[in-house]
């Protein structure tokens, strides 16, 4: 079962250009975890690399701040962005640093994987920059790959949803 999942992961990510073969002098091991639905998920074990990495301290939204922003809102829409971390490219030339080793060979990701310590902060920064104007208008908040649109009236809500979807 694990071999089948590994082969699927490698084939899909090689095909989509998210990874390529590597000759890196270092590599992280991989293992599988069982997800809630019983399926397996491949995990790159970047604990050693993450320990040595300078941490990006970009703040994530605090729940207490979110509650304050939602005051008075009556209409809510939650969107889940399906292109999250795996669409943020790693700086060219740095790919070798995050190589991972499998029984099928050594590979380098060309995009961020969730297990990299700065992935959440980097993705949050990107999302906040993309939606800067709409966040400033007070009609939405972003928490990683979750978007919450909130307004006081139905008319405002329809307009806000259109604005967010145009940006996406």
Where in this protein do the model-derived segments appear?
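Retroelement reverse transcriptase polymerase core
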Residues: 1-168
């Amino acid at each position: 079962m694990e071999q089948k999942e590994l082969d699927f992961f490698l084939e899909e990510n090689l095909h989509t250009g998210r990874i390529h073969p590597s000759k890196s002098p270092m590599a992280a091991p991989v293992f599988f975890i069982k997800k809630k639905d019983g399926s397996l998920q491949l995990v790159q074990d970047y604990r050693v690399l993450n320990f040595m990495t300078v941490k990006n301290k970009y703040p994530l939204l605090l729940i207490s701040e979110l509650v304050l922003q939602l005051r008075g809102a009556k209409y809510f829409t939650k969107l889940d962005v399906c292109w999250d971390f795996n669409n943020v490219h790693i700086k060219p030339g740095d790919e070798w640093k995050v190589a991972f080793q499998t029984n099928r060979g050594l590979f380098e990701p060309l995009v961020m994987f969730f297990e990299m310590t700065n992935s959440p902060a980097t993705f949050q920064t990107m999302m906040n920059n993309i939606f800067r104007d709409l966040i400033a208008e007070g009609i939405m908040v972003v928490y990683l790959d979750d978007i919450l649109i909130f307004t006081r009236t139905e008319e405002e809500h329809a307009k806000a949803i259109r604005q967010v979807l145009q940006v996406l």
